[in-house]
UniProtKB/Swiss-Prot annotation:
Pfam families: FMO-like. GO terms for molecular function: flavin adenine dinucleotide binding; N,N-dimethylaniline monooxygenase activity; NADP binding. NADP(+) binds at residues 214-219. Its cofactor is FAD. Belongs to the FMO family. It comes from Arabidopsis thaliana. GO terms for biological process: glucosinolate biosynthetic process; response to abscisic acid; response to jasmonic acid; response to salicylic acid. This is Flavin-containing monooxygenase FMO GS-OX-like 6.
């Protein structure tokens, strides 16, 4: 697994994106001895955590020629996980008592996460690797069977250029291109429609009857945010489990999915109940989108499956020169970015070996076949979770838990790299948090104090960051 020291090599690597994935990818690559260039279209680090009041002119984000806004952060957004388990392994996301402008809450708002990422970039001198306000519009192999990659880019001033790299790591996120559910009659429904990507504040829905489609993180948050000002909020969700939800909001109602909508403004649910509504908010998730990537068919996106990819990271035919960080959802994102990046960096240096292309493809094909045999749609390929905690997989039997848990996934990567995997306390905090009551869980929690103390004992191993005293 580990080659002799003289076979370790340094690569010239491009990282696409300076969000939470791109920042830690750059750090891990440089730690492994690689030369790194990060391309970031915005003026600052942070990726999806960069909050802007701007929304797209097409509130459903259907128009392919629209001006794209690359943030989906709404004003009231707070983390849905406690800060201790959110951070990178060796850069604790703890409170900042030395700075009164910081959010000290255990479930802080989006601004605090943004400040944490800025602190991380400063501590590890990552900004010196970034080309800000530079959009990548083409990534492709330089030639057939080539081990080099051409990256073409354009600055905000309109100046274009290209560079050649040994490898490209894709960290562009997947919260920009919305998915929409198919609803019969929606084209002629007269009310206002908006995707959560373009939701910022609840004011436009004051006094209205609002339908919220979807009840994952954004649907849960946004429905409650709107309920403060709206006349009624009706949530349409796929799982029967949501029908059992209770809420402190008397105007918040749960329904099964929508059967059809009509020109008179009515919305009919699968159980036959009819509501006349003023607006529909689509909290229906996002599509994986890589408009800049040209691989001559080696990597495709089909029904939100990016593939073929070995362990959600490497396309067998193009490995290790092309890799993806952060595709799996329903997992501890920052920790996952970090351990995936460590694996990629180690493979690129030659310190860790991948299986052959044929062996990787066999693994991918077997995984896809298992998903198909269980009737799991392609769009759930990158769900990294225990099915018993995910209502959409509630009909699966325990032995059918083909979607491996995040701890199994992290442990497997850690074994490849010879590094530490997820800490016990971090996993337990995550498991507790995802089962919390939606109304109050951010301000009322019953975590075992020993788990929290264990986290802070781990944090004490790391020297206080220089940024804490600035």
């Amino acid at each position: 697994m580990t080659p002799p020291p003289n076979s370790i090599s340094s690569r010239n690597v491009a990282v696409i994106g300076a969000g939470a994935a791109g920042l830690v990818a750059a750090r891990e690559l440089r730690r492994e001895g690689h030369t790194v260039t990060i391309f970031e279209r915005q003026k600052q680090v942070g990726g999806l955590w960069v909050c802007t009041p701007n929304v797209e002119p097409d509130l459903l984000s259907i128009d392919p020629d629209r001006t794209v806004v690359h943030s989906s952060v709404y004003q009231s957004l707070r983390t849905n996980l406690p800060r201790e388990c959110m951070g990178y392994s060796d850069f604790p996301f703890v409170t900042r008592p030395d700075d009164e402008s910081r959010d000290p809450r255990r479930y802080p708002d989006h601004r605090e996460v943004m400040r944490y990422l800025q602190d991380f970039a400063k501590e590890f001198k990552i900004e010196e690797m970034i080309r800000f306000e530079t959009e990548v519009f083409r990534v492709e192999p330089t030639a057939e069977n080539s081990c080099k990659w051409r990256v073409q880019f354009r600055s905000s001033s309109g100046v274009s250029g290209e560079d050649i790299f040994d490898a490209v790591v894709i960290c562009n996120g997947h919260f920009t291109e919305p998915r929409l559910a198919h609803i019969p009659g929606i084209e002629s429904w007269p009310g206002k429609q908006i995707h959560s990507h373009n939701y910022r504040v609840s004011d436009p829905f004051k006094g209205q009857v609002v339908i919220v489609i979807g009840y994952q993180s954004s649907g849960s948050d946004i429905s409650r945010d709107i309920a403060i000002l709206a006349k009624e909020v009706h949530i349409a969700a796929k799982s029967d489990a949501y029908a059992k939800e209770s809420s402190i909001y008397s105007n918040l109602h749960f329904h099964p999915t929508i059967d059809r909508v009509y020109e008179d403004g009515s919305v009919v649910f699968q159980d036959g109940k009819l509501i006349f509504a003023d607006a529909i908010v689509h909290c229906t998730g996002y599509k994986y989108c890589f408009p800049f990537l040209e691989t001559k068919g080696y990597v495709n996106v089909e029904d939100n499956r990016v593939g073929p990819l070995y362990k959600h990271v490497f396309p067998p035919a193009l490995a290790p020169g092309l890799s993806f960080i952060g595709l799996p959802s329903m997992a501890l994102q920052f920790f996952m970015f970090e351990i995936q990046s460590r694996w990629v960096a180690s493979v690129l240096s030659g310190r860790v070996k991948l299986p052959s292309e044929e062996q990787m493809m066999e693994d991918v094909i077997a995984f896809y076949a298992k998903l198909k045999s269980l009737g799991i749609p392609k769009r759930f390929t990158h769900f990294l979770t225990d099915p018993q905690w995910t209502p959409m997989f509630e009909k699966l039997k325990p032995h059918e838990a083909v979607l491996i848990s995040q701890s199994e996934y992290f442990n497997w990567i850690a074994e490849q790299c010879g590094c530490s995997s997820i800490e016990r306390w971090r996993e337990e905090q995550y498991n507790i948090a995802i089962k919390k009551d939606d109304d109050n869980f951010r301000d009322e929690w019953d975590d075992d104090d020993q788990i929290i103390q264990e986290a802070y004992r781990d944090f004490a191993k790391f020297k206080p960051s220089k940024v804490w005293s600035t």
